[in-house]
């Protein structure tokens, strides 16, 4: 894959853009090298960068369009050559460039006849259009085309069910993928001890290959930052292994629900031996002077845990039994 | 080179024949009607009949659910012959409406496109065959087949006695038949060539004496009468009418065939079976028995005839005229009796004819709903041939030889395009160039090669004739006149394949596709495919869903253009002119001084729920020629059929996700809308306009479900609806009986204080799986019901956009089909050496055993075409030009692509067509080079959304109390015998019990489960037998068999009877 000999200093790791081309406003190409790398390193970085470039880079897209006059996506508007659906498809294609967080609004307000292109979109200052000539619609009559747009910056793609919005706006399934294609190749030299990594990047113009490279590496570094912390953090992930598998609030939550459902006096009259507890738990509870359900409910989960021989599984079991028998504690009638 | 005939032409020609000849022929049979006193004559003028142009447009007929038909007017004359009044009254009268064929070759009946497919039948006539009987002795038979399919068999046995079989019953002596037909012994013996055989026969059977006896015996056989019927004149007449006239009518074709086979010269208009025929047939049978003369091949196309639309419609017209005649007779009689003055018009009305056609189009098996999945389906449907239907075969009894390909099919019936399953070989497809000849025979064109005329002369030959010519098979051409070896070509002669010198060839085929149907001729590299897979492909192309954005195929056969053109999916300029207005839904064209408004199809539903849509392709102000394409339809691009998409494919295993033909796809196909299609569903509700009312106030239901209704109670246009939403709110008044509710239901109502309603909600709800955008709402008045009970219906059309998803079926054009098993992000897909991730991963094991190598050629050539930006149109059998022509072409194109794009990996000489590719997850190259390519892949109509189904609760069958089956009825999955074994094998007794009782037909147990769910407690174990077993016991009882069980008490030995 190497076509020209490139002299690279063998000392420090360096990157360089060796080739860049712009086939059109919406197709940019760049080729980068990184060297010198030790044997095997190029592959490690290359595949990670390729995947990061393809999967991790954010893009800006129109996610939603709204127009007053349209009855539905498949309707036709007098004086417009395209159907609404085709206009939405054209809007989906429009490439934007922004440093936006979250969403923002934009609009199109054009009077016909004439062609509506991307440059007719009225955008907030921090969003700009990459290719002004992108076609949106062609108006054949002197009519007004007003479309409100919503712009979002995100990653990957979205396919939305339109049902969540009943306000007459139409979702455009956006594709936030500015990198069209990425490739890496490795060239080794010095008897295969050193390697040069080549990265090829094609983008859709909303960011240059160089920017894509920056962003991809930043995203990659962000993902690796946790490992840089010297001390392990107390993530719930690790806690769970030896402390409590139950989220701390559920027990109370459920009990509260139960208490609401039933009157307290009812609880008082129900003894725990009615609730088919396993003997061991039953004995544990008995030893701690818990006789009725009300007594049981007065203890929090931590209290229960403090009892002798009481294990976390038992709490779960109690919960299960309570829920099963308590809600439906009517006498079992034979049919 | 001749052009390919229009694909709908078969249908058009048929219909024209009916209008031009059929009508006149049947009208000429209409008799002069006289009343009993011979006072009045009523007759039609044959030469004056008119069809009036339909009052409505084709499109309106579909929209309003009407029939697209034209009125038939006939001049009629009423002659008064009695003395008081003696005059002639003439009038042009309306006798009914005839549905008219539309430009699709179909009819519109009640708003539904219907097509009448051609039937292929055994031609009436006589056929000699030899069969081995039970003792292994060959028996010679001559079968006389009548016009409607009835059979009469002559059979000669070992002792050279001739027997007759009428409809496979006991055999009779031929003398009985001949006597019954009115000949006496002397006449018989005088008119046969071998009277001694008949004489010997006579000695055996003494009892044939008189004609009466013969008729009696024959009648007994024919009508299966028990006992001894007494001879009477009426019996003789009955036999004449039922047997000799109805069952033995040969028809025009039959008479012609009989004359030809038996060397007779009976005039053409004598269409019944005559004694002379039988005598000649018997003579011929004797000769064949003794080795003189040839046997017939029943399956030869020569002995088949096509019953086309023309014949079927003509037959119905004849039937209608008989009814009309009876009506006229009745009315004349009534008029004279009640003394009203008849006029020609009030003697007849339009109901007999109109009703006959209505019934025909609705109920006749050969009148089918036009399948409109995609444009290809439409044209292919009209070119079908069926052996089934009235007068034909039945699918269950048809034998293997009938279904098989016959050498005479060459160029007439496609050898590969037929349906799979029970109808295999019985429903075929016409070859591209075939046409229907005069006597219902299928003709195929050939070029005549003769020394004298240099220019090739084309002639159409019927099935019997081309066998006697040397026909060059066309799979190898004598291109180089100089070389001796190439002067020898393969040829067909008398159903054999020979290799003969080029000079001896008399005919050659005109076109490489000549022997294929349209479906098969759209397969590139078909010659590299196994016929079974080509069959699947031609069927699957008809199931392809039009995609939201179509794409031309890179590798095609060149027939795509005409297929799209003839399908009617495109909007075509009817005359030249200038466009002065275009819009999304119409084009206005001015030319010849007037303006033509061409309405375009906008998101319309086809009967397979696919979406039909036309996109205008002309700009305002452009001048248009006649026949120019104005708008592309669904699944057409650039005037060519475009059913699928060219996608990058790799043939390799991938983590088992392409096991058993499953297909792995990239997310790109989802988010870039590569395989996104639109589906429009129609939901309809009948409204009984008396008591029922449509409203948006339905107290039974939650407000949330009613959110889309407007103030009239109908769903709003453009609203998004989900499963369970109300489309039309309707209330039906109801007499409420408190006791009609289930006890627990009543209890719940009391507890929760629910109101008791005086009306029932009978809303139209969106069924399971339905979701989408409401694009149209129509009120339709149904015209067919009586005036007293006017019913209306509301139709709601919902458009759904479906991306490709796991479970959808995709297929190539070589019978390579599969189900999507997983959708991977693009970075995880294997990628090529330039970083491009592939779109689909097929299983390489799907190729060798299926023998559809065409897909490999196609994908490689597709890749080359994609890189070079070229499109290839390849006629089949390019191997006739040189050895391995396909491979050479593909490799040379790949090589060029690799050179032009400077990508050496596209063509690697040590593994041409294959390339090293990388795993997207690890970046490692795969062990072996992998075939990559760009084939054309279709998305088929079998989609999970239409099939996925589960049942929690639902209805039960009335009788067995088992859950219903089928998704439409929200049915359950059958736990059959083998499933029970599986559960037994795992020892899961309780699950098995649950399957057989609570979840199925144990009524009491399943009610108890309901109670237990509400009130808690253990689910009781059912003790007695489930309902279907009880049903079985009762069925046995109805056969007087008692099945019961008793409990015997150990102490008292008392029997305790248990009711099963």
Swiss-Prot record, chain A:
- What is catalysed by this protein? RNA(n) + a ribonucleoside 5'-triphosphate = RNA(n+1) + diphosphate
Class of the enzyme per the UniProt entry, highest EC level: transferase
- Give the EC number(s) listed in the UniProt record: 2.7.7.6
Q: What is this protein called?
A: DNA-directed RNA polymerase subunit alpha
Among the Pfam families in the record, one is: RNA_pol_A_CTD
Write down the superkingdom of origin. Eukaryota
Q: What family name appears in the similarity comment?
A: Belongs to the RNA polymerase alpha chain family.
Give the GO molecular function terms: DNA binding; DNA-directed RNA polymerase activity; protein dimerization activity
Which example biological process does GO assign this protein? DNA-templated transcription
Q: Which InterPro entries match?
A: DNA-dir_RNA_pol_insert, DNA-dir_RNA_pol_RpoA/D/Rpb3, DNA-dir_RpoA, RBP11-like, RNAP_asu_C, RNApol_insert_sf
Q: How does it assemble?
A: In plastids the minimal PEP RNA polymerase catalytic core is composed of four subunits: alpha, beta, beta', and beta''. When a (nuclear-encoded) sigma factor is associated with the core the holoenzyme is formed, which can initiate transcription.
Keywords for the protein's UniProt record, in alphabetical order: Chloroplast, DNA-directed RNA polymerase, Nucleotidyltransferase, Plastid, Transcription, Transferase
Alpha N-terminal domain (alpha-NTD) as annotated region, ranges: 1-231
Q: Where in the cell is it found?
A: Plastid, Chloroplast
Q: What are the GO cellular component annotations?
A: chloroplast; DNA-directed RNA polymerase complex; mitochondrion
Tell whether Flavoprotein is among the UniProt keywords: no
Where is this chain primarily localised?
plastid
Free-text function comment from the UniProt entry = DNA-dependent RNA polymerase catalyzes the transcription of DNA into RNA using the four ribonucleoside triphosphates as substrates.
List the residue ranges of the region (Alpha C-terminal domain (alpha-CTD)).
263-335
* Domains: entry comment: The N-terminal domain is essential for RNAP assembly and basal transcription, whereas the C-terminal domain is involved in interaction with transcriptional regulators and with upstream promoter elements.
UniProtKB/Swiss-Prot annotation, chain B:
Q: Does the keyword Acyltransferase apply?
A: no
Query: Where does it primarily localize?
Result: plastid
Q: What are the subcellular locations of this protein?
A: Plastid, Chloroplast
Q: Entry's CDD domains?
A: RNA_pol_B_RPB2 (cd00653)
Q: Which reaction does it catalyse?
A: RNA(n) + a ribonucleoside 5'-triphosphate = RNA(n+1) + diphosphate
What is any one of the record's Gene Ontology cellular component terms?
A: mitochondrion
**What molecular function does GO assign, one term?**
DNA binding
Q: Which UniProt keywords apply?
A: Chloroplast, DNA-directed RNA polymerase, Nucleotidyltransferase, Plastid, Transcription, Transferase
Binding partners and assembly: In plastids the minimal PEP RNA polymerase catalytic core is composed of four subunits: alpha, beta, beta', and beta''. When a (nuclear-encoded) sigma factor is associated with the core the holoenzyme is formed, which can initiate transcription.
Instruction: Report the protein name in the record.
Output: DNA-directed RNA polymerase subunit beta
Task: State the gene name recorded for this protein.
Answer: rpoB
